[in-house]
UniProtKB/Swiss-Prot annotation:
Main location: cytoplasm
Gene3D superfamilies: PRC-barrel domain (2.30.30.240), RimM (2.40.30.60)
Protein family per UniProt: Belongs to the RimM family.
Name under which the protein is recorded: Ribosome maturation factor RimM
UniProt source species: Marinobacter nauticus (strain ATCC 700491 / DSM 11845 / VT8) (Marinobacter aquaeolei)
Pfam families listed in its UniProt record: PRC (PF05239), RimM (PF01782)
UniProt KW keywords: Chaperone, Cytoplasm, Ribosome biogenesis, rRNA processing
An MF annotation (GO) of this entry: ribosome binding
Superkingdom, natural source: Bacteria
Comment text on domains: The PRC barrel domain binds ribosomal protein uS19.
InterPro entries assigned: PRC-brl_dom (IPR027275), PRC_barrel-like_sf (IPR011033), RimM (IPR011961), RimM_N (IPR002676), RimM_N_sf (IPR036976), Transl_B-barrel_sf (IPR009000)
Function recorded in the entry: An accessory protein needed during the final step in the assembly of 30S ribosomal subunit, possibly for assembly of the head region. Essential for efficient processing of 16S rRNA. May be needed both before and after RbfA during the maturation of 16S rRNA. It has affinity for free ribosomal 30S subunits but not for 70S ribosomes.
Length: 175
């Protein structure tokens, strides 16, 4: 999930499904069908914001399919393919202490426990065993390398300071 001001991207419309205007959705929520808990969406497509209501949805195989209000034709549905699905950030459930949404970690400056700047969290990857921070170099970092750092709280990630916009990791800069 990525955040843009007061909205968070929770998924993307990927393709049409069937002939009655249903759409396939790639969900960024965990669990994947958590996207169905949000009824009022804002779609961002080609720079345009489109408010729309989720009428119904369900798991279909490995993915999610949805029917949006007012869309009951395959060709009309096709025009929404590629749209980002956004919801107001305030609608996201509050997480327990020490847990974070990905969008909260993106943009944090990353420092080693020794105080060396490794760069800034650009995005995260879901690998199955653990999530991975993709850290891009910045003007103040020790070098210009991109780093992949496992997101393992208490093992690798020692501190997350959202207010200070920084993260401290126990990580060898040579990796």
């Amino acid at each position: 999930m990525t955040q843009n001001s007061q909205e968070t991207v929770i998924g993307r419309i990927t393709s049409v499904f069937g002939v009655k205007g249903w759409l396939k959705v790639f969900s960024y929520t965990d669990p994947k069908d958590g996207i169905l808990n949000y009824r009022d969406w804002t779609l961002l497509l080609d720079g345009k914001r489109i408010p729309i209501r989720l009428e119904e949805g369900r798991r279909q195989g490995q993915g999610i399919v949805v029917r949006l209000k007012g869309i009951d034709d395959r060709e009309v549905a096709r025009t929404y393919c590629g749209a980002e699905i956004r919801v107001p950030t305030e609608q996201l459930p509050e997480l327990p202490e020490g847990e974070f949404y990905w969008h909260q970690l993106e943009g944090l400056d990353v420092f080693t426990v020794e105080g060396e700047c490794l760069g800034k969290v650009h995005h995260l990857l879901e690998t199955g065993s653990n999530d991975v921070l993709v850290v891009h170099a910045t003007a103040g970092s020790i070098d210009q390398r991109e780093r992949l750092i496992p997101y393992l709280p208490d093992q690798v990630v020692q501190q997350v300071d959202l207010k200070g916009s920084r993260m401290v990791v126990d990580w060898d800069p040579e990796f």
